[in-house]
Amino acid sequence: MSAFIVLGAQWGDEGKGKMTDYLAEEANVVVRFQGGNNAGHTVVVGDKEYKLRLIPSGILYEDKLNVIGNGVVVDPKALFEEIEYLEGVGVKISPEKLIVSDRAQLIMPYHKVLDKLKEKARGKNDIGTTGRGIGPCYTDKFERCGIRVCDLLHEDVFIEKLRENVEMKNAYITKVLGGEALNFDEILDEYLGFAKKLRPFVQDTSVKVYDAIKADKTVLFEGAQGMLLDIDYGTYPYVTSSNTTAGGVSSGSGIGPNMITNAVGITKAYTTRVGKGPFPTELLGETGDWIREKGHEYGVNTGRSRRCGWLDLVIIKTAVRVSGLTSLAVTKIDTLAGLEKIKVCVGYKFNDTVIDYFPASLEDLAECEPIYEEFDGWDDSVADVRSYDELPENVKKYLARISEFTGTRISIVGVGPKRDQTMRIDNL
């Protein structure tokens, strides 16, 4: 029995899609357990580039079962657009390769309208939402008025729930936020059309995943976003609306925590984040710009430029603790090639004291000054390296310090965006 998790250990965009694709070769089942189509990732196989948002990365293999779990919020329109895109580039999609939980919450048109209007109303205090309705959908889930996939497949139930929601949301949209009312009949027609297309893919995915584990098949749980975007442990309120840490796996997939054997944390060799919020190691000058351009640090979904900075080991150590990471995968070693000196943060100066933890308060975090250790860089291009022994000595020293500080083995190193630019150096 083997069930392991792939999680982001930073603010997202660490290369989880690539690592999931790489590790999916060892898996029989790949499961998304949280988030929605707000988290895009790119997978490069040979000369082909695939951009995924909602569908698990295992879809690029012919023989893997891909699962959208109950913890995911599903926009049917986005799902079928992604299916159409994948089929257009030669990836076959069928209910034998992809299943969707009957317990997953549906993103509705009013969720997207609310997302954008509320963000506009926040003014300078906006939180940088993607506007895809993720937060409002999770809000409805916890207010117990959300519409689930199973509701969509029962037309009478769906009509009743949709009518109640549209009435309530229209009142709020028009009277409080100053927006235009949505048309009930238009939404109904559109979603009844989705119901017919979605029905063949719908199952009790918890049972399917449980049975796979019990049958000694290998299951990979694919996280979206990263630890610092977790609703509880992230830089709140500049976070997503779900649990991106290992704690979200059981509730988002219906599998007990005792069935999970390993958790791999993905980290870049440096740090990036999108949007607002404190960023202790951010590089605002030429070095930050150089990393951004060389690393192509722009969002898959939004195209927004990412803020770049030195690797913050306090963050990685926090991710190890919160998610019980058993190993780390370090990506984008190749991006740093060419820098004379490279720094890593090993603590913060705060109120005339030294701390080695990540503060909950954003105000406190904003006052933290990073304490750096400096390493010699590497001029060698590492993009063609395929074994640990061939890596430059300075890269090995850099990786050794990451492992030493976090108390965690490094199992995988990435030296480029392609599937074959990945080397396994230890067990997960």
Curated annotation (Swiss-Prot):
<dbReference type="GO" id="GO:0046040">
    <property type="term" value="P:IMP metabolic process"/>
</dbReference>
<dbReference type="InterPro" id="IPR001114">
    <property type="entry name" value="Adenylosuccinate_synthetase"/>
</dbReference>
<dbReference type="GO" id="GO:0005737">
    <property type="term" value="C:cytoplasm"/>
</dbReference>
<feature type="binding site" description="in other chain">
    <location>
        <position position="130"/>
    </location>
    <ligand>
        <name>IMP</name>
    </ligand>
</feature>
<feature type="binding site" description="in other chain">
    <location>
        <begin position="38"/>
        <end position="41"/>
    </location>
    <ligand>
        <name>IMP</name>
    </ligand>
</feature>
<dbReference type="InterPro" id="IPR042111">
    <property type="entry name" value="Adenylosuccinate_synth_dom3"/>
</dbReference>
<dbReference type="InterPro" id="IPR042110">
    <property type="entry name" value="Adenylosuccinate_synth_dom2"/>
</dbReference>
<dbReference type="GO" id="GO:0000287">
    <property type="term" value="F:magnesium ion binding"/>
</dbReference>
<keyword id="KW-0963">Cytoplasm</keyword>
<feature type="binding site">
    <location>
        <position position="144"/>
    </location>
    <ligand>
        <name>IMP</name>
    </ligand>
</feature>
<feature type="binding site">
    <location>
        <position position="306"/>
    </location>
    <ligand>
        <name>GTP</name>
    </ligand>
</feature>
<comment type="function">
    <text>Plays an important role in the de novo pathway of purine nucleotide biosynthesis. Catalyzes the first committed step in the biosynthesis of AMP from IMP.</text>
</comment>
<comment type="subunit">
    <text>Homodimer.</text>
</comment>
<comment type="pathway">
    <text>Purine metabolism; AMP biosynthesis via de novo pathway; AMP from IMP: step 1/2.</text>
</comment>
<feature type="active site" description="Proton donor">
    <location>
        <position position="41"/>
    </location>
</feature>
<feature type="active site" description="Proton acceptor">
    <location>
        <position position="13"/>
    </location>
</feature>
<feature type="binding site">
    <location>
        <begin position="414"/>
        <end position="416"/>
    </location>
    <ligand>
        <name>GTP</name>
    </ligand>
</feature>
<dbReference type="InterPro" id="IPR027417">
    <property type="entry name" value="P-loop_NTPase"/>
</dbReference>
<feature type="binding site" description="in other chain">
    <location>
        <position position="225"/>
    </location>
    <ligand>
        <name>IMP</name>
    </ligand>
</feature>
<feature type="binding site">
    <location>
        <position position="13"/>
    </location>
    <ligand>
        <name>Mg(2+)</name>
    </ligand>
</feature>
<keyword id="KW-0547">Nucleotide-binding</keyword>
<dbReference type="GO" id="GO:0005525">
    <property type="term" value="F:GTP binding"/>
</dbReference>
<feature type="binding site">
    <location>
        <begin position="300"/>
        <end position="306"/>
    </location>
    <ligand>
        <name>substrate</name>
    </ligand>
</feature>
<keyword id="KW-0436">Ligase</keyword>
<keyword id="KW-0658">Purine biosynthesis</keyword>
<dbReference type="Pfam" id="PF00709">
    <property type="entry name" value="Adenylsucc_synt"/>
</dbReference>
<comment type="similarity">
    <text>Belongs to the adenylosuccinate synthetase family.</text>
</comment>
<feature type="binding site">
    <location>
        <begin position="40"/>
        <end position="42"/>
    </location>
    <ligand>
        <name>GTP</name>
    </ligand>
</feature>
<feature type="binding site">
    <location>
        <begin position="332"/>
        <end position="334"/>
    </location>
    <ligand>
        <name>GTP</name>
    </ligand>
</feature>
<dbReference type="GO" id="GO:0004019">
    <property type="term" value="F:adenylosuccinate synthase activity"/>
</dbReference>
<keyword id="KW-0479">Metal-binding</keyword>
<keyword id="KW-0460">Magnesium</keyword>
<feature type="binding site">
    <location>
        <begin position="12"/>
        <end position="18"/>
    </location>
    <ligand>
        <name>GTP</name>
    </ligand>
</feature>
<feature type="binding site" description="in other chain">
    <location>
        <begin position="13"/>
        <end position="16"/>
    </location>
    <ligand>
        <name>IMP</name>
    </ligand>
</feature>
<protein>
    <recommendedName>
        <fullName>Adenylosuccinate synthetase</fullName>
        <ecNumber>6.3.4.4</ecNumber>
    </recommendedName>
</protein>
<feature type="binding site" description="in other chain">
    <location>
        <position position="304"/>
    </location>
    <ligand>
        <name>IMP</name>
    </ligand>
</feature>
<keyword id="KW-0342">GTP-binding</keyword>
<dbReference type="GO" id="GO:0044208">
    <property type="term" value="P:'de novo' AMP biosynthetic process"/>
</dbReference>
<dbReference type="InterPro" id="IPR018220">
    <property type="entry name" value="Adenylosuccin_syn_GTP-bd"/>
</dbReference>
<dbReference type="InterPro" id="IPR042109">
    <property type="entry name" value="Adenylosuccinate_synth_dom1"/>
</dbReference>
<dbReference type="InterPro" id="IPR033128">
    <property type="entry name" value="Adenylosuccin_syn_Lys_AS"/>
</dbReference>
<feature type="binding site">
    <location>
        <position position="40"/>
    </location>
    <ligand>
        <name>Mg(2+)</name>
    </ligand>
</feature>
